From Swiss-Prot:
InterPro entries: Ribosomal_bL33 (IPR001705), Ribosomal_bL33_CS (IPR018264), Ribosomal_bL33_sf (IPR038584), Ribosomal_zn-bd (IPR011332)
GO CC annotations, alphabetized: cytoplasm; ribonucleoprotein complex; ribosome
Natural source organism: Myxococcus xanthus (strain DK1622)
Protein name: Large ribosomal subunit protein bL33A
Keyword Nucleotide-binding: no
Cited SUPFAM superfamilies: Zn-binding ribosomal proteins
A matching Pfam family: Ribosomal_L33
GO biological process, one term: translation
Family the entry assigns: Belongs to the bacterial ribosomal protein bL33 family.
GO molecular function term, any single one: structural constituent of ribosome
C-alpha cells in the first residue's frame, strides 16, 4: 500500500520565529504555504503562523 500525499509540516510564529505546532497537509490539494492564526506561548498572544519544514 503506497504512502499518502500528506507531509508533516511545522508552523512557526512570524514574530518570534519559534516552531510551536506540527500538522500534516495534502501536497496535491494545497500547494501554497499554509498560514494560520494560532496562540504563541512565547509571545503570549495570537499571532500568524507560517508553514516551515520539520
Amino acid at each position: 500500500m503506497p504512502k499518502g500525499n500528506r507531509s508533516i509540516i511545522s508552523l512557526e510564529c512570524t514574530v518570534c520565529k519559534e516552531r510551536n505546532y506540527t500538522t500534516t497537509k495534502n501536497k496535491r490539494k494545497s500547494q501554497d504555504k499554509l498560514e494560520l492564526s494560532k496562540f504563541c506561548p512565547r509571545c503570549r498572544k495570537h499571532q500568524d503562523h507560517k508553514e516551515g519544514k520539520v
